[in-house]
Amino acid sequence: MAARLALRGGPGAAGQRPWLLLAPLLLVPLLARPAEALVEGLYCGTRDCYEVLGVSRSASKAEIARAYRQLARRYHPDRYRPEPGDGPGGAPPSAEAFLLVATAYETLKDEETRKDYDYMLDHPEEYYSHYYHYYSRRLAPKVDVRVVILVSVCAISMFQYFSWWNSYNKAISYLATVPKYRIQATEIAKEQGLLKKAKEKGKNKKSKEEIRDEEENIIKNIIKSKIDIKGGYQKPQVRDLLLFQVILAPVHLCSYIAWYCRWIYNFNIKGKEYGEEERLYIIRKSMKMSQSQFDSLEDHQKEMFLKRELWIKENYEVYKQEQEEELKKKLANDPRWKRYRRWMKNEGPGRLTFVDD
């Protein structure tokens, strides 16, 4: 028995005693975790937001709002009268008290922020996670991204609409100065008696300039009604605006898929012969022209394309080569191009040198 006691009291027992003494110290961080949950720089800092407002964690939003209004009236800088020891939860009586109350209310009034705050109080060990959630919410955009996109699309559509109308009116004003169209429009106006009516209405009431402006507007209106402008200066259509293009995008996508499937089935699988519409489509794609650009071409040009069978690749390559040769001939006979070539030959473009004089 004495031998057993001697063994228990030997050097091994002495080595274990420090660990027994350190065990209570190791429990201290575990017991101190609720205090460590309050981190400076997050939410209310080292103060508990619930204690700042004087409410419990189970308080409703109405109770939190009521407590905030009472404390805000009490500690507002315009109303606050300092008293010894005054302040929420024992805080110093200053403008910081009002900011602390406002911060506590902003933290607890939002459901998502309140959940993050409660989670921080319950899980203080997740230190970096709390920082991430806190700053991700603070730095997140306050405005819905969908609203921003919608407003941007509407603004771009409005700019498009007014810009297109401006271009269209400029084109009409230009056509009104071209003798060919102006004479035709004037004859139509005379046949309809519009110019005579304008002069009668302006008799003894309007000046010559006003009568001239009215006649000019009549000619422009006739040109608008008789001439179909195509291309970039065509009359604006609401369906071409970006807003309507975005709205109708699913419809256009479904239409394109259906059209593509019909194309594959009719011409690739069944081997049908191309119709006029399909031939013009292939020609337009070969020329790398948009639909509006191709529509602006004259009808006799399209007939020439069909007559030369340009939808066939070999025929189009021959036509392309001819156009390039014709362009070279035009440039060779162009006086401006000749001057440019002489200048390049004699002087050439300026050079940048780094040689010291």
Swiss-Prot record:
Keyword Chaperone included in the entry's annotation: yes
J domain ranges (all copies): 48-121
Gene3D superfamilies: DnaJ domain
A cellular-component GO term for this protein: membrane
Compartments, record wording: Membrane
Transmembrane is among the record's keywords: yes
Keywords of this entry: Chaperone, Membrane, Transmembrane, Transmembrane helix
Pfam families, per the entry: DnaJ
Regions that span the bilayer: 19-39, 147-167, 241-261
Protein origin, superkingdom: Eukaryota
Example GO biological process: protein folding
Topological relation to the membrane, as annotated: Multi-pass membrane protein
Similarity comment text for this entry: Belongs to the DNAJC25 family.
Designated name of the protein: DnaJ homolog subfamily C member 25
Organism: Mus musculus (Mouse)
Gene that encodes the chain: Dnajc25
